Each structure stands twice: as structure tokens, then as C-alpha cells.
Amino acid sequence: MTLKLAVLRQIFQGSKGWHLWQHWRAFYSSSASGNGKLCCQTGTTDKNTHATRVVDLSYDLYDGSAPGPPLVLLHGLFGSKSNFQSIARALVRKTGRKVLTLDARNHGCSPHDDIMTYPAMSADVCQILHKLQITSCVLIGHSMGGKTAMTVALQEPKLVERFVSVDISPAATVPQTGFPHYIAAMQKVHLEGKIPRSTARRLAEEQLSSTVKEASIRQFLLTNLVQENGTFKWRVNLEVISQHLQDLLDFPEFQEPYPGPALFLGGANSPYISSENYPEIERLFPCANVEYIFGAGHWVHADKTHDFLNSICNFVESA
């Protein structure tokens, strides 16, 4: 089912509000051609062709016995595969399929590298799929991971049976995210000597609190504080992430659309998938649906886990 007016009307009622539906209806009517498809300019792929070194990603594989392509989970910026442990186990129980979770380059237990772009992260994912002899999969990516999933689908569509982009669209992300401030605050954290882990976390949180006001975000960032050789450090590559932050907020340009099923699953309380993004979603992913989960913000899978799992399972089983 494509992004048609009837689908969008059903989505808007009770979620983003009737005023958004009216706005989109007017926009669609003025932008669509006679056959109901949006008239959009095609881009180029010049930014996606440069070579880069592929990183051997760290992964966890949750075994399942049911047939069907495995589910591959991709985390967001400052996240790691451990964010999806409970989600992965639940998906194995509900679908019976294998579930693979990955640490992106410069995150978690994966190696660091000087390049942090979506084509590079796409190449990393393709390599691990090849290494594990996975010829087709269902990609599920949150935020940065969602843009990585889109890039893999657009570059290597035969590898992706379908995909889910969680609370992110193929549009440039407005830098209202606070990520530049988070990076700067993390870089300023200083922990002296060999101290207990509990003390290190407390001191780091105190230093972050002047910039990162939300306690939940501080706790999320602190999952990256690790001990190495008796001292504490950030396991994410802050320097490279900072250098490539604009690459991560942007999205590469593509000409050819992805022909398979896609789901853009947003939080109803989050601004990251809006009506302004629908034309580009329609252009690149003509078989996409857009759904919103009530009461969820950007971290949809954490805010409304039950609803998130139901949406994922319904989409996976809709083949």
C-alpha cells in the first residue's frame, strides 16, 4: 500500500491532528500529477560512490527456527546493539525468526574509523550480511540506523526484503536535536584516576547536567562510559562523530527508488517524520506506509514497546 490520501487521512485522524491532514491534502493536490503520484525531481548518486574502508561490525545473533528473512536491528546515534536486547528477544518469540543486532562503526564494540557516512555504514552492513551468508533480510533501523537501513535498501535492494525506519525520514534532519551540544558536553567530561564505576557515572552525570538537562538523555549517553586499563572513557568516537555530524543529519541523494515494502514508524509526539517529508518518502519508497504510535517520542521502541512490537510484527507478517 502506497502513500495515498486515504491512508494519510486515516493516519492523521487522532494522531498528528486534523489540521495536518488538511495541510497535506492541499499540498498533495497542488503537487501531484493526474495519476496520483507526486511530481518530484530526481537526485544524483555522486555522493554515494566514493570508496571507503569497510569495518567488521560487532554483532549479536538471536537464534530462531521459523522460515523467512532474519530481522536486522540498527541503533541510532550514541546507541549500541545492547539497546535492542529485550526487543530482539521479543521479536524472536513473536516471529520465530532469527534476529541480528549490530554495533555501527565508532559505536559499541565495533572498531573506530575516520569516516562516518551513510554509504560507509551501508557497506559495513552489507559486509556482515555477506559474512553471515544472509542473502535477504528485514532491516529495522532507529534514527541514524533508519537512515542506514534506507541507504542499504536503495544501494542493494536485493539484500532487503523490506525495511522499517523508526522515527526518521530520508530528509535532512534539522539540527534541533541537541546532538552538537551533547558531543561538546561529553568531550568536556574529565574523570581523574582510578575510581569506582558508580563514582565515575555520578561525576560524569554531574558534569553533563549543565548542558544536557533531560535526565533520560544523560542516562542514555552514560551507557557509553566504559572502563579501560583502570580509567574511564567514552566508547563512541566523539571526534569523528563531531566531524561527520552534518553527514549524519543529512541524507545521500539517490535517483532510483527502492521497490520493496517499507514502513516509516514515527512517534506521534516526535517531529522527525512530518508531512513535509512525505514527497521524498513517496519518491524514494513508493511502496511505503507511514504510521505513528500514540504517546511515543523519538525513542519509539522504549516509550511504547508493546505497540512498537505489534507494528513491527504486523508489517513483517504482511508479506
UniProtKB/Swiss-Prot annotation:
Main location: mitochondrion
Transit peptide as recorded in UniProt: 1-28
Listed GO MF terms: lipase activity
Protein name: sn-1-specific diacylglycerol lipase ABHD11
Catalytic activity annotation: 1-octadecanoyl-2-(5Z,8Z,11Z,14Z-eicosatetraenoyl)-sn-glycerol + H2O = 2-(5Z,8Z,11Z,14Z-eicosatetraenoyl)-glycerol + octadecanoate + H(+); a 1,2-diacyl-sn-glycerol + H2O = a 2-acylglycerol + a fatty acid + H(+); a 1,3-diacyl-sn-glycerol + H2O = a 1-acyl-sn-glycerol + a fatty acid + H(+); 1-octadecanoyl-2-(9Z-octadecenoyl)-sn-glycerol + H2O = 2-(9Z-octadecenoyl)-glycerol + octadecanoate + H(+)
Taxonomic path: Eukaryota, Metazoa, Chordata, Craniata, Vertebrata
Cysteine pairs bridged by disulfides in the record: none
Cellular component, GO, one term: mitochondrion
Transmembrane helix in keyword set: no
